């Protein structure tokens, strides 16, 4: 049986653009701080035009790679959503390179697999996003201070274009933090609702999903998918590799309690 994940190639492309975007943002922040420090020396007058041109190039590159990352990421997310439904209900909506990957199951079994998929995904995602948020907090605080100082210095020196660039970079850092914070909150809410559905099923005499349980599950599935799509944030692969062993132990306990 093939195990190819249909969205992998699409996420690989989005991941490349995210790397380019990250390096451009870090390079722009570093260049901004260094050029601001150099602006207090006399020889800066000879390189001022070059600094302006490089700053504009960074700004254009950041906007371009952000646009490309978001478009390719949303395309990959669309394929992944179709793949999730295929996996749970035995349909063929996603890329045909996963032919043979999906099993034919009845509707109730499909809902159970869908609940397990969203439950497991939200459990792992909440831990990864929490780690990403802590790292972003440090970056926003430290990087934001230097960039804001550079922005003020450029404003005092009447270098409006460079001041705008520094202001843009500081807003980018703050926006990334706010997006991660909102994503963590939404994923935690989904995780709690999945636990509630599991408890409700465990306490029910019904062996199948009730209409209300189906509606709640579909709502949480939509909330989880929309949270990922709107945030346009790829979960950190290094954190995934680091946290996955612990996650597998936690998920095994949950699976044995509610799904086996």
What are these regions (language model features)?
Residues 1-2, 138:
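Polar low-complexity intrinsically disordered regions
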Residues 3-18, 71-134, 186, 190-260:
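Conserved non-transmembrane functional hotspots
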Residues 15-70, 133-186:
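Alpha-helical transmembrane segments and their immediate juxtamembrane boundary regions
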């Amino acid at each position: 049986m093939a195990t190819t994940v249909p969205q992998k190639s699409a996420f690989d492309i989005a991941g490349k653009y995210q790397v380019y975007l990250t390096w451009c943002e870090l390079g722009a922040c570093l260049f901004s701080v260094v050029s601001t420090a150099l602006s207090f020396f006399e020889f800066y007058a000879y390189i001022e035009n070059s600094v302006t041109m490089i700053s504009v190039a960074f700004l254009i590159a950041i906007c371009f790679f952000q646009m490309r990352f978001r478009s390719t990421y949303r395309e990959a997310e669309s394929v992944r959503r179709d793949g999730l439904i295929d996996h749970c209900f035995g349909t063929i909506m996603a890329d045909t390179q996963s032919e043979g990957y999906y099993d034919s199951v009845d509707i109730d079994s499909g809902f159970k697999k869908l609940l397990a998929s969203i439950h497991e995904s939200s459990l792992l995602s909440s831990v990864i996003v929490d780690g990403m948020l802590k790292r972003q907090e440090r970056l926003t605080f430290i990087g934001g201070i230097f960039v804001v100082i550079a922005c003020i210095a450029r404003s005092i020196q009447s270098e409006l274009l460079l001041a705008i660039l520094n202001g843009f970079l500081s807003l980018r850092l703050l926006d990334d933090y706010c997006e991660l914070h909102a994503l963590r909150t939404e994923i935690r809410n989904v995780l709690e609702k999945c636990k509630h559905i599991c408890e409700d099923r465990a306490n029910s005499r019904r062996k199948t999903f009730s209409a209300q349980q189906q509606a709640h599950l579909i709502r949480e599935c939509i909330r989880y998918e929309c949270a990922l799509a709107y945030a346009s944030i790829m979960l950190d692969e290094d954190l995934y590799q680091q946290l996955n062993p612990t996650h597998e132990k936690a998920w095994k306990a949950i699976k044995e309690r509610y799904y086996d």
